[in-house]
Amino acid sequence: MIQMQTVLDVADNSGAKKLFCIKVLGGSKRKYAGVGDIVVCSVREAVPNAKVKKGDVVKVVIVRTAKEIGRPDGSYIRFDDNSGVVINNQREPVGTRIFGPVARELRAQKFMKIISLAPEVL
């Protein structure tokens, strides 16, 4: 469960390391974002000579949350961290690699490029 002012880790090689959530997209009164949702973030930490710089405002899709996700079969899945992947306006990842597992719920949101780049889909 991601809300405004949440600090996110980055699960790709776009160059950002830490992100600060500015806004949850999807309506003026929307407070929380889960896996597969898009948030607007600012880059708090970045590596030198990267595609994104510190202070850039980027769109991010959430791929892992520490809050458990309920599945239709009654099972739950949760991760150790809150992580996202930096995307462009065409909903494609800026980076070329994805680190760590991603949730299967991304498939329903049509993030197929992220699913195919991920080493593991849980």
UniProtKB/Swiss-Prot annotation:
It comes from the Bacteria. Keywords: Ribonucleoprotein, Ribosomal protein, RNA-binding, rRNA-binding. InterPro entries: Ribosomal_uL14, Ribosomal_uL14_bac-type, Ribosomal_uL14_sf. GO terms for molecular function: large ribosomal subunit rRNA binding; structural constituent of ribosome. GO terms for cellular component: cytosolic large ribosomal subunit. PANTHER family: 50S/60S RIBOSOMAL PROTEIN L14/L23 (PTHR11761), LARGE RIBOSOMAL SUBUNIT PROTEIN UL14M (PTHR11761:SF3). Part of the 50S ribosomal subunit. Forms a cluster with proteins L3 and L19. In the 70S ribosome, L14 and L19 interact and together make contacts with the 16S rRNA in bridges B5 and B8. Binds to 23S rRNA. Forms part of two intersubunit bridges in the 70S ribosome. This is Large ribosomal subunit protein uL14.
